[in-house]
């Protein structure tokens, strides 16, 4: 199973929190101390918490469950998109649209619209339209791709959500909480761990730290999917037994 060591975290700067004046007292138990007015996160908490989350993700992926990657702030966007795509998992990296989970029926209609427009752009429909109409549909498609393209293949609500910067993604977390979807969240010293089922105390701003988290989560997804592919499902067992009986 994928594991991340304390050395990995130290080299990625996971232990650097925010300036001490911005701290959230609810994160007190995860803080080791302060250096140059910057809180230092106690990695003795972070390492086991993150590895527990990785084990959970591996097990979920082995059961073909969907993990939604969420990171819409600039420092996280590129990495979240790349790693979720690598793992074959849904993601939101542009902007969280209110109701993305709690009003999924409406979102599903937008996904259908995006699918229709994509088909039209490929089957020659756009070429038959006026230049203005084709441009309008093309822009509509690009806008939808940017906002919901990462979840177009989700096929329903996710089974868990992985979040970078829980303060920035508070609306997404509230929606997940309302629906009972477990949340794995990277929580910095200025944030509240409330509503987070699996708290990963750590730096949520440094690109190297964000890469470390997202890459490890993606690796766990791939590890789980691989083990799932190597285990025959129930129907295959039945077929094999029937064949042997004959």
From Swiss-Prot:
GO terms for biological process: translation. GO terms for molecular function: structural constituent of ribosome. Keywords: Ribonucleoprotein, Ribosomal protein. Residues 225-246 are annotated as: Disordered. SUPFAM superfamilies: Ribosomal protein S2. PROSITE patterns: RIBOSOMAL_S2_1, RIBOSOMAL_S2_2. The keyword Ribosomal protein applies. The keyword Ribosomal protein applies. GO terms for cellular component: cytosolic small ribosomal subunit. It holds the Pfam family Ribosomal_S2. HAMAP family: Ribosomal_uS2_B. Belongs to the universal ribosomal protein uS2 family. This is Small ribosomal subunit protein uS2. It comes from Cellvibrio japonicus (strain Ueda107) (Pseudomonas fluorescens subsp. cellulosa).
């Amino acid at each position: 199973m994928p594991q991340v060591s304390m050395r990995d975290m130290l080299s990625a700067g996971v232990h650097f929190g925010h300036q001490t004046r911005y701290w959230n007292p609810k994160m007190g138990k995860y803080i080791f101390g302060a250096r140059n007015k910057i809180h230092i996160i106690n990695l003795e908490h972070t390492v086991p918490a993150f590895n527990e989350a990785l084990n959970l993700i591996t097990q979920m992926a082995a059961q073909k469950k969907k993990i939604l990657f969420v990171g819409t702030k600039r420092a996280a966007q590129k990495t979240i998109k790349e790693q979720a795509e690598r793992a074959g998992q849904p993601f939101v990296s542009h902007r969280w649209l209110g109701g993305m989970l709690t009003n999924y029926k409406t979102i599903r209609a937008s996904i259908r619209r995006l699918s229709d427009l994509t088909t039209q752009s490929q089957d020659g429909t756009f070429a038959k339209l006026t230049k203005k109409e084709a441009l309008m549909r093309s822009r509509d498609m690009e806008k939808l791709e940017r906002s919901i393209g990462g979840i177009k293949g989700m096929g329903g609500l996710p089974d868990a959500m992985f979040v970078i910067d829980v303060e920035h993604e508070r609306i997404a977390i509230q929606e997940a909480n309302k629906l009972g979807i477990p949340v794995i969240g990277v929580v910095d010293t200025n944030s509240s761990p409330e509503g987070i089922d699996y708290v990963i105390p750590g730096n949520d701003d440094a690109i190297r730290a964000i890469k470390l988290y997202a890459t490890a989560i993606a690796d766990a997804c791939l590890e789980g999917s691989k083990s799932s592919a190597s285990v025959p499902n129930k129907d295959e067992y039945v077929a094999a037994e029937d064949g042997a009986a004959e």
